[in-house]
């Protein structure tokens, strides 16, 4: 059966193809290899390409037809960088300084059992904020994640930032287990759709884990031009990819 060039299966990385900040299982690599024979495939995530390589592999751009690091602000096609933009060109240095100062003051007042380093991470597409600090260990990450479910540290901080910067272009969403994504309106994961539309794709299937309101998959999951599929972990992603293929008449993952 010839590949359906009108259809793309688009994947979040963290929590979807791999467990949070962990290596992608070999099973998922084989899934992508099988899937690519049936439809176009792409990945989209808020992290930069270096972090996505840590999880998927150094050959990530060879595995996928399309790569959308930093929500598609960086756009790769067949392994080649096609375009890239920078958030600082939108925000300006003065606003960014004001924003960073507010964030650092706010974080200094949060009482956590432990704090590590890298509380603000500047990326081309967003500012990523972590109350515990992105340098925390995996064990510390999980402890913060469980504590945050009860204490709502990130939810409260998002509310404070929305109030303080309500007249700005910034949007705030809870990302992954330890952080908050801050980006210009429209620079969420739906940003990648502007590139996909130019590729002759008619059917977009998106798989992501943070699809709840306030999660960083919410906007693309609910976009009118996207078939959004919510997943709980890589094993769930595998099952739902298989189900989606059968539903659109392309056979399951093992049927090549």
Swiss-Prot record:
Chain positions recorded as Mg(2+) binding sites: 12, 14, 209
Reaction(s) the record says it catalyses: alpha-D-mannose 1-phosphate = D-mannose 6-phosphate
Enzyme's top EC category: isomerase
Residue numbers binding alpha-D-mannose 1-phosphate: 21, 123, 134, 141, 179, 181
GO biological process: GDP-mannose biosynthetic process; mannose metabolic process; protein N-linked glycosylation
GO cellular component, one term: cytosol
Positions annotated as active site in the UniProt record: 12, 14
Disulfide bonds: none
Enzyme Commission code(s) on record: 5.4.2.8
GO molecular function: metal ion binding; phosphomannomutase activity
Keywords annotated in UniProt: Cytoplasm, Isomerase, Magnesium, Metal-binding
Gene3D superfamilies (UniProt xref): 3.30.1240.20, HAD superfamily/HAD-like
Location in or out of the cell: Cytoplasm
Known pathway: Nucleotide-sugar biosynthesis; GDP-alpha-D-mannose biosynthesis; alpha-D-mannose 1-phosphate from D-fructose 6-phosphate: step 2/2
Function: Involved in the synthesis of the GDP-mannose and dolichol-phosphate-mannose required for a number of critical mannosyl transfer reactions.
Family: Belongs to the eukaryotic PMM family.
NCBIfam families: HAD-SF-IIB
Oligomer status and interactors: Homodimer.
PANTHER family in alphabetical order: PHOSPHOMANNOMUTASE
Full protein name: Phosphomannomutase
Organism per entry: Encephalitozoon cuniculi (strain GB-M1)
Lineage, opening ranks: Eukaryota, Fungi, Fungi incertae sedis, Microsporidia, Unikaryonidae
């Amino acid at each position: 059966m010839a590949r359906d060039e009108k259809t793309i299966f688009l994947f979040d990385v963290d929590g979807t193809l791999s467990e949070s900040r962990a290596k992608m299982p070999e099973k998922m690599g084989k899934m992508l290899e099988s899937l690519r024979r049936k439809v176009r495939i792409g990945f989209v995530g808020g992290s930069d390409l270096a972090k996505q390589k840590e999880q998927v592999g150094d050959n990530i751009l060879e595995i996928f037809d399309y790569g959308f690091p930093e929500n598609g602000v960086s756009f790769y096609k067949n392994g080649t960088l096609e375009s890239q933009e920078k958030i600082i060109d939108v925000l300006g240095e003065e606003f960014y300084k004001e924003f960073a100062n507010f964030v650092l003051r706010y974080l200094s007042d949060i009482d956590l059992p432990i704090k590590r380093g890298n509380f603000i991470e500047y990326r081309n597409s967003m500012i990523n904020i972590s109350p515990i600090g992105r340098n925390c260990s995996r064990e510390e990450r999980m402890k913060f994640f469980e504590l945050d479910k009860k204490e709502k540290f990130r939810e409260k901080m998002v509310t404070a930032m929305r109030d303080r910067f309500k007249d700005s272009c910034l949007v705030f969403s809870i990302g992954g287990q330890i952080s908050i994504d801050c980006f210009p309106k429209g620079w969420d994961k739906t940003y990648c759709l502007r590139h996909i539309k130019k590729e002759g794709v008619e059917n977009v299937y998106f798989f992501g884990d943070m699809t709840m309101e306030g999660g960083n998959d919410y906007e693309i999951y609910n976009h009118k031009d996207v078939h959004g599929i919510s997943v709980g972990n890589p094993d769930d992603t595998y099952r739902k990819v298989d189900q989606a293929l059968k539903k659109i008449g392309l056979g399951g993952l093992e049927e090549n």
